[in-house]
Amino acid sequence: MSSIITLLTYYWLIIFSIIGYGLLFNKIFLRSESQNLGFIGIYGIFSLLLISYISSFFLPHTQIFNLVILSLGLINFFINKVIFDKELKKLIFIFGFLIIFIFISKNHDDFSYYHFPYTHLLTEYSGIIGLGNFTHGFKTSSSIFYLSSPVSYTHLTLPTTPYV
């Protein structure tokens, strides 16, 4: 039971961190005061993807890196939380409902073939280029791998649920 509570807490922290990065992206690059939480979430995912793509050449996405990335997004979220308190209630309701589907879903059939190994390599090593020569599954890297590596919870002792 405690592992499910830990997992749920981590999911909420990831969501709030993504929104924090979206707010930062919106403020710096778009110079907009938009309060549309959907667009801010997309901006946050884009920001995390950009950070992940660039940092994977220089740093492995270790526990410390993930903690720093998560913390920076959370700090920015809590600094700017007042901007959209009404939208925040909608987010909590919608994500609270959708989290049910996360728990009843199953892994894709090729998760153990290349989804998990590629994400695991991103968390262990930096500058991994040419992995397509080793196995067919690594020839085309997906942005999902790079999005899941900075928010992976490999440092937590949880049951084997690969959802991030």
Which residues fall in each region the model found?
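Membrane-embedded, hydrophobic transmembrane alpha-helices
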Residues: 1-84
